[in-house]
């Protein structure tokens, strides 16, 4: 299971804060591993640390897991690495995933009331008249369909 946008928002926010504070990417990853991260994030940081230990670039080390890191993320991290501005790159990713999580949450919240009305309409329009007429369930279901 891949990260949710909300999880990625928090993940990249923490990395951005640590890199901005002067931590190296390895130290930031190790410090984050000392906290209670979801297993998938911890695995990603361990793989990143192993990749960096093997001499890979930050982008290559992060991008090794195609299921967790998208092409967009790889490219933004790569641009930040090449430009020497990793903290802003991670913050851009955090902002992007924060906006995505907010948009998804707002869309789901916006659908709650119409779904309630739909179910209430089905109940009032089909089930109540059937039950009031003392019909059995088969007749009610036939009227519904």
Feature map (PLM): residue ranges:
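Catalytic metal-binding core of the metallo-beta-lactamase
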Residues: 1-117
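Bilayer-spanning, highly hydrophobic alpha-helical transmembrane segments
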Residues: 99-145
């Amino acid at each position: 299971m891949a990260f949710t946008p909300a999880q990625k928002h928090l993940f990249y926010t923490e990395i951005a804060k640590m890199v901005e504070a002067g931590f190296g990417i390895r130290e930031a990853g190790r410090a984050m591993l000392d906290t209670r991260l979801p297993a998938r994030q911890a695995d990603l940081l361990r793989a990143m640390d192993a990749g960096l230990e093997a001499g890979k670039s930050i982008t290559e080390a992060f991008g090794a897991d195609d299921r967790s890191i998208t092409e967009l993320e790889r490219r933004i991290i790569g641009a930040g690495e090449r430009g020497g501005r990793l903290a802003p790159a991670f913050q851009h990713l955090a902002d992007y995933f924060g906006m995505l999580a907010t948009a998804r949450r707002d869309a789901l919240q916006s659908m709650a009331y119409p779904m309630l009305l739909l179910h209430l309409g089905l109940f009032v329009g089909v089930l109540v008249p059937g039950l009031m007429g003392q019909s059995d369930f088969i007749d009610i279901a036939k009227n519904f369909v």
